[in-house]
Curated annotation (Swiss-Prot):
Enzyme class at the top of the EC tree: hydrolase
UniProt EC number: 3.1.11.6
Catalytic activity: Exonucleolytic cleavage in either 5'- to 3'- or 3'- to 5'-direction to yield nucleoside 5'-phosphates
UniProt subcellular location: Cytoplasm
HAMAP family, per the entry: Exonuc_7_S
Gene symbol of the encoding locus: xseB
Protein name: Exodeoxyribonuclease 7 small subunit
Any one of the GO CC terms: exodeoxyribonuclease VII complex
Disulfide bonding pattern of the chain: none
Keyword annotations from UniProtKB, A to Z: Cytoplasm, Exonuclease, Hydrolase, Nuclease
Organism: Clostridium botulinum (strain Okra / Type B1)
Length: 71
């Protein structure tokens, strides 16, 4: 069975939780390293989602301009 794709908002919330836990300084160095690694992975996923959305918006904007010019 395939894993359900996580939403942008859920990934962002997880990242915020990781940052908060690291900021409070109450976790061990080992846990901090694990959290940092997970945070980097989440950042990369979030960046990809944003870049994909940016690409889709660019395509829509380009199509909008073409439609306007052809009118």
């Amino acid at each position: 069975m395939g894993r359900k794709k996580e939403s942008f908002e859920n990934m962002l919330e997880k990242l915020e939780t990781i940052v908060d836990s690291m900021d409070n300084g109450e976790i061990t160095l080992e846990d901090s390293m694990k959290s940092y690694e997970e945070g980097i992975k989440l950042c990369n996923k979030l960046y990809k989602v944003l870049k994909d959305a940016e690409g889709k918006i660019k395509i829509l904007e380009d199509n909008k301009e073409e439609d306007f010019e052809n009118s």
